[in-house]
């Protein structure tokens, strides 16, 4: 008994996060396998249930079965629950229920919560968790109410479920939709390309969910006083704005030329917002230009911001790497932004995360292309979508073999738990040594 207790204590917060996500995924897969989870009342193959559960918990949106037509109301409810748990984070949800039960949160649990939401300090973590959960449900409720008239107008009373499902899916950056039918599978939001209400509501939910819980806290605390924001919040907001506006302008001039002006603007903005880990689409993705698809791959790899419902290598990672490059060009020792120096460890972490994501994306694409005999560009789009936990696809996901599906499952999982979380969980502190090897310079560039 004492040995088991000792082992539990040895589990770091990073290992708890990694194992927590894995546990929820497996449990979700087992439930989705049950006959009453599907409309046909059949047992779903384990690899398909596992793929769907992983995609939901990792808030990705890639599917091998159409969510609207294949899964029953029970199955859809389970998927939505998995999305909500995955969006908030397994640790955050567990901590919230512990608080509801009146249990005292230990220091170790607070430390795990801190790592789970990328908080700068342990102090105030319980208050922040309450703020996150309440804010999440409030924003999702607002999104549901805004979309309610449109969906109820199209689907009657069923529109209430439609509005709730798509509001949660959008806020959690999941990209799952239940609009498909047996005759029209995998439609996403293509039927609403010109609907201003749905487009704006979904984009708002995606952006708010993707900027990070700490950024919300900063905005709510300091209101519109931008100068009072933390440096990280400033970097996140500016980077997010640039990653929306620049691609949208490019898409406007290179794609959607056959649409009326209003729809063209909406489509350009929507396809600029959604690749950053949301996965909805209003446009015909295969019909977009090759250069636009390449830009979308980059957006998918970047993803959202730390401590958010989004995946990807994060906006701050991109910003730190660019700022570091600027500091080299200006012959400065440290990267600087907003009147502050960026810690050198942040630059090293950003480089490690970026290399990890690009390797997963590239190697995964090559393996799938080889296994399936598909064009490499199409497979790279798929793996970028998986490791960035986006959910956009050029239509190949349902046709992939079991090996390729397993590769995507691994990529989705690694993309959601986060690069540094995985690295810290895998490497023991025992490997760290105070001794340093002799220094020698190496030429780069």
Question: What are these regions, as identified by a protein language model?
Answer:
Residues 1-445:
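Membrane-proximal intracellular helices of multi-pass ion channels
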């Amino acid at each position: 008994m004492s040995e088991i207790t000792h082992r539990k204590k040895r589990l770091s917060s990073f290992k708890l996060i990694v194992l927590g996500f894995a546990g929820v995924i497996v449990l979700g897969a087992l439930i989705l396998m049950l006959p009453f989870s599907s409309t046909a009342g059949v047992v779903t193959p384990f690899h398909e249930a596992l793929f769907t559960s992983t995609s939901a918990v990792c808030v990705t949106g890639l599917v091998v079965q159409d969510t609207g037509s294949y899964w029953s109301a029970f199955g859809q409810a389970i998927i939505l629950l998995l999305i909500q748990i995955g969006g908030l984070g397994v640790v955050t949800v567990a901590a919230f229920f512990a608080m509801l039960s009146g249990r005292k949160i230990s220091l170790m649990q607070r430390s795990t919560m801190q790592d789970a939401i990328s908080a700068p300090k342990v102090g105030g973590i319980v208050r922040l968790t309450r703020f996150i959960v309440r804010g999440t449900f409030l924003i999702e409720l607002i999104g549901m109410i805004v979309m309610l008239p449109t969906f109820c107008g199209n689907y009657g009373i069923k529109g209430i479920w439609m509005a709730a499902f798509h509001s949660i899916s959008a806020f959690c950056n999941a990209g799952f939709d239940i609009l498909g039918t047996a005759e029209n599978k995998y439609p996403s939001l293509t039927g609403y390309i010109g609907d201003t209400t749905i487009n704006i509501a979904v984009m708002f939910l995606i952006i708010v969910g993707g900027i990070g819980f700490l950024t919300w806290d900063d905005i709510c605390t300091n209101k519109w006083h931008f100068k009072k924001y933390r440096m990280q919040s400033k970097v996140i907001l500016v980077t997010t704005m640039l990653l929306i506006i620049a691609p949208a302008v490019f898409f406007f001039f290179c794609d959607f030329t056959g649409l009326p002006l209003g729809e063209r603007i909406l489509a350009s903005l929507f396809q600029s917002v959604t690749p950053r880990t949301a996965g909805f689409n209003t446009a015909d993705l295969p019909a977009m230009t090759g250069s636009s698809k390449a830009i979308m791959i980059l957006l998918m790899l970047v993803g959202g911001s730390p401590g958010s419902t989004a995946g990807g290598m994060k906006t701050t990672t991109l910003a730190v790497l660019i700022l570091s490059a600027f500091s080299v060009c200006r012959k400065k020792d440290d990267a600087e932004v907003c009147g502050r120096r960026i810690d050198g460890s942040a630059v090293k972490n950003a480089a490690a995360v970026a290399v990890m994501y690009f390797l997963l994306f590239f190697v995964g694409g090559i393996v799938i292309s080889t296994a399936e005999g598909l064009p490499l560009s199409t497979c790279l789009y798929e793996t970028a979508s998986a490791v960035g936990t986006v959910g956009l696809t050029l239509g190949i996901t349902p046709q992939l073999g079991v090996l390729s599906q397993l590769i995507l499952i691994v990529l989705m999982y690694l993309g959601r738990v986060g690069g540094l979380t995985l690295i810290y969980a895998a490497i023991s502190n025992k490997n760290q040594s105070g001794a340093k090897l002799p220094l020698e310079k190496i030429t780069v560039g």
